[in-house]
Amino acid sequence: MGISYVLEDIEKNENGLKSESFTKILGTIVLSPKKEMPYSKIEGKWITNDDYIVIHRLTVDSEIKNKGIATKILEFSEKECIKNKILSIKTDSHENNEPMKKFLEKNGFSYYGVIYLDREPDIGEMRIVYEKIIKIPHKLF
């Protein structure tokens, strides 16, 4: 998985993405507010069952990895959650994706179990799942 999948989504206009001219794409993320069936069938237990955003396709250009770009993208995601008064960010990863697991844990995500995908071409594939609770400033409520 990488930038080609995201560009494909932009071309299809999936996830509400719009194509624009860029000099260079440094990184991408897809934030999905949709409730996803595999996330409701977790083998484990989420921290919360409240509204959540799912992170898909977090990717950074390989030429600039380890420069904090992914963390900045994640910080943007958290700000979007705060704007929308959403307390939880959830995501999944391949079991053997050690760099992603390390990145998530370094950025405050915790492991909560496994799910099995329900969409082609990955039906039945296991993913490990993580969740992070966002601290929303009290004055927003």
Describe every region a protein language model picked out:
Residues K34, D92-S93, E105-M126:
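Conserved catalytic-core motifs of GNAT/GCN5-like acyltransferases
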Residues L58-V60, S93:
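Hydrophobic adenine-recognition pocket in adenosine-nucleotide-binding enzymes
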Residues L74, C81-S93:
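Conserved GNAT acetyl-CoA-binding A-motif
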Residues V60, N66-K79, K106:
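Conserved acetyl-CoA-binding loop-helix of GNAT-fold acetyltransferases
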Residues K24, T28-R57, K65, D118:
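Conserved acyl-donor/pantetheine-binding loop and adjacent beta-alpha core of acyl/acetyltransferases
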Residues I73, N97-M100:
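Conserved short alpha-helix immediately C-terminal to the canonical SAM/SAH-binding motif I
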Residues M1-V6, I10-L17, S32-M37, V54:
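A short helix-loop-beta-strand connector motif used in the catalytic cores of GNAT acetyltransferases and
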Residues G2, E125-E131:
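Short hydrophobic/aromatic beta-strand or adjacent loop that forms the aromatic wall/cage
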